[in-house]
């Protein structure tokens, strides 16, 4: 069925890019949406071309296309990941304000009881941010902050990135060896 991947304008777009690369290498179906600020942040934070990221997905959609298949509950998916998830997008979803394809697809996942994982990338967090996360968590949304572990002695930035990517894959039951798990020697 496939996983929807949304990249928003929060700092840390490389997490989303690494996730889509990983899903592509696993030959899994993906549906990609990048917000306007997600695209701008990719240009600011990386030397990666947007077209490259789009080509990694099975299908990509314009965030303004509210008629895209992923905007309907009748279009079956395995769920959605918003990585990184800006606080604007988080607030939009938490308050049912479906003003673009990303927030609409997330609302569809909630109403259809499909897996929705948000990877917030903000610090510090205000009470409003935390309340929005609690609201989503109470609806069954997985809140997976971009907070990598250090127990496995990461030596590169990729080690830190793949720790989070591996945790996202775990949320969907996708077997992976992206990071060293606690208590497991490699």
Spans of model-derived segments:
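A cross-family phosphate/adenosyl-ligand binding-site feature
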Residues: 1-117, 123-186
């Amino acid at each position: 069925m496939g996983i929807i991947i949304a990249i928003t304008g929060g700092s840390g777009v490389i997490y989303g890019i690494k996730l889509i690369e990983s899903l592509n290498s696993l030959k899994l179906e993906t549906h990609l949406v990048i917000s306007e600020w997600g695209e701008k942040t990719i240009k600011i934070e990386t030397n990666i071309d947007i077209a490259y990221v789009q080509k990694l997905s099975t299908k990509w959609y314009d965030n303004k296309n509210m008629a895209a298949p992923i905007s309907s509950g009748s279009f079956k998916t395995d769920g959605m990941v918003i990585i990184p998830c800006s606080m604007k997008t988080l607030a939009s979803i938490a308050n049912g304000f479906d003003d673009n394809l990303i927030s609409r697809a997330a609302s569809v996942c909630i109403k259809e009881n499909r897996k929705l994982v948000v990877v917030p990338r903000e610090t510090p967090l205000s009470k409003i941010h935390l309340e929005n996360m609690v609201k989503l968590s109470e609806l069954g949304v997985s809140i997976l902050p971009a907070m990598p572990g250090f127990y496995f002695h990461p030596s590169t930035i990729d080690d830190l990135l793949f720790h989070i990517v591996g945790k996202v894959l775990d949320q969907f039951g996708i077997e992976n060896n992206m990071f060293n798990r606690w208590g497991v020697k490699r």
